Amino acid sequence: MVVLKTSKELSDMKLSCKISAQALKLAGELIKPGVSTAYVDQMLHEFIVSQGAKPTFLGYGGFPASCCISVNDEVIHGIPSGRVIEEGDIVSVDVGAAINGYTGDNAATFAAGKVSEEAQKIMDVTKECLYRAIEAAQPGNRLGDVGYAVESYAKSFGFAVVRDYVGHGVGRKLHESPSIPDRKSVV
């Protein structure tokens, strides 16, 4: 069930999302060949804390880092390590910040230097899937319409969606309703 928020609660949520988005922007500046994923995590941790917030993922369900960093074919929730990013890698970063009792959560994929045509294509198609999902998230539509917009566009380029994960709302908790599938469903 979606819990309606007051203006003050929405303001607090916007702040947490703004900090998360700024951390994600920093990640994009840090992702380059020769940098370890642990270093990126450390820098994002320090940034979030400097804003008076707490890294949402650190300790969440036992997660040992402040952000999830997945390289190439790793599917979300990658654990930062000494792994060094290489030229041509695509690196997905998922980061969250909590402040005033509310959580923000943002993710994006970045190119480390020059990437292959295939890697660039999947990044471009994925970004367009996001835009199509946003466009489909309109009054009167169902969540399945959002998922259909994502899945049908991805499939038109020969890609598939990862069926084990969904988008989600945020608020006082990291994962709140609604769950938003990335495929056509009966929702």
PLM feature spans:
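Active-site neighborhoods and metal-handling regions in enzymes and metal-associated proteins
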Residues: 1-187
